[in-house]
Amino acid sequence: METRTLEDWRALLEAEKTLDSGVYNKHDLLIVRGQGARVWDAEGNEYIDCVGGYGVANLGHGNPEVVEAVKRQAETLMAMPQTLPTPMRGEFYRTLTAILPPELNRVFPVNSGTEANEAALKFARAHTGRKKFVAAMRGFSGRTMGSLSVTWEPKYREPFLPLVEPVEFIPYNDVEALKRAVDEETAAVILEPVQGEGGVRPATPEFLRAAREITQEKGALLILDEIQTGMGRTGKRFAFEHFGIVPDILTLAKALGGGVPLGAAVMREEVARSMPKGGHGTTFGGNPLAMAAGVAAIRYLERTRLWERAAELGPWFMEKLRAIPSPKIREVRGMGLMVGLELKEKAAPYIARLEKEHRVLALQAGPTVIRFLPPLVIEKEDLERVVEAVRAVLA
C-alpha cells in the first residue's frame, strides 16, 4: 500500500484547490479515510461526520458488506450497457422492487439524483402528453437543466434562464395553492417529502395526501423526490410510508449505492411503457459495479433495519437540541435523522466553529439552518457530543 507523507497530502490539497473548477467553496482540510460515522483528515484529526456525504453515507463510511460486494464485482465485470443484460442488474431490480409497494415495479437506473429527476420529468411528459410541472417553493431537485427547472432557489436558476417551461411554484404545504396550480395541462407535481436544501421542512400529511388525490383527479403524475429521504433516513425505509400514499414515480439516489454513485427512477408499469424505445438513455446507469453496491446496500439496510434506529435516535436528538438554552435558536425540526436547527442569524459561522473547535462536521440548509445528516449507524454517545458542541458554539 502506498505511503504518503504529510507534505504529500498538503500538495494534493493544494492541487485540488488550484486545479478545481472553483464551483465549490473548499474547506481547509483533506479527508483521507472514514469508518462508520467518523472521518479523519491528513493530520490525523478525527471528526464526527454529520454531513454524511450530503446523505450518501446512511450505512456508514466503509461499510464492509458494500466494500466486499464492490471488490467481487470489480474482479468480474464493471461496465456493460443496458442493451446487454447482466445478472447483477436483474438482482438489483428484484432487490429494490421487493421493498417497494407492488405498484412501483419498473426501474430506470442512473448515476445520481439529478439524473433520476431528469428521467422522471421525461417519463411524466411521455406518459401524459402534457408539458407543465408544478413544484414547491424552497424545493430542490438538482442542478442539471431539467431538474434545475423544478428547483426553486433563484440563485441557482437565474444565471441559466431560460429553463424548461412551464413550471409553476407553489408554497410548500399549501393545499389550496396546489389545487389552483394543478390543471388539465399539468404533466406532474414533483415534491420532496422533507425539503432538504430548503431548510429541512417536513411535508404535512394533509399536503402530500392532497397532492396524491389532486394529481389523480386531474390525470397528472405525482413524482416524489426521495433522493435524500430514502433508504431509512426519516425513520421509514422511504418517507412516503409516513403519509400512506404511493407516488407514480419515486426518485432515489444518495444512500442507494452505499457510497457508490447510483440513482434510480422507479415507476408504475404504465408510466414506463409510455416512453418510446430510445426515448431516454444512460451510458453508465445500471453498470454491474453500481448494481452490486446497491444490492449490498439494500440487503444491509433490510437486515439491520436502520430506519428503526433513525426513528429512535432522531426524535431524541431533536429534543436534546431543543433543550439548549440559547436565544439564537429559532426552531428545531426534521424527520428521523434528517434534522435542521434554524437560527435567528446566519448559520455559516457556527458550522465553521463546530468543525474547527469541536471536530463536528455539519452543513447548511439555507442561510440560517444547520443541517445534520449523520450516518444512521452513529452511536448515541456521538450525538451527545454533537449536542454539547452545538451548545458550546451557541453559548
From Swiss-Prot:
It comes from the Bacteria. Its main location: cytoplasm. Its EC number is 2.6.1.118. The modification N6-(pyridoxal phosphate)lysine is found at K254. It is found in: Cytoplasm. GO terms for cellular component: cytoplasm. SUPFAM superfamilies: PLP-dependent transferases (SSF53383). It is an enzyme of class 2 (transferase). It holds the Pfam family Aminotran_3. Its cofactor is pyridoxal 5'-phosphate. It catalyses: [amino-group carrier protein]-C-terminal-gamma-(L-lysyl)-L-glutamate + 2-oxoglutarate = [amino-group carrier protein]-C-terminal-N-(1-carboxy-5-oxopentan-1-yl)-L-glutamine + L-glutamate. Pathway: Amino-acid biosynthesis; L-lysine biosynthesis via AAA pathway; L-lysine from L-alpha-aminoadipate (Thermus route): step 4/5. Catalyzes the transfer of the amino group of L-glutamate to [LysW]-aminoadipate 6-semialdehyde, generating [LysW]-gamma-L-lysine. This is [LysW]-aminoadipate semialdehyde transaminase. It comes from Thermus thermophilus (strain ATCC 27634 / DSM 579 / HB8). The gene is lysJ.
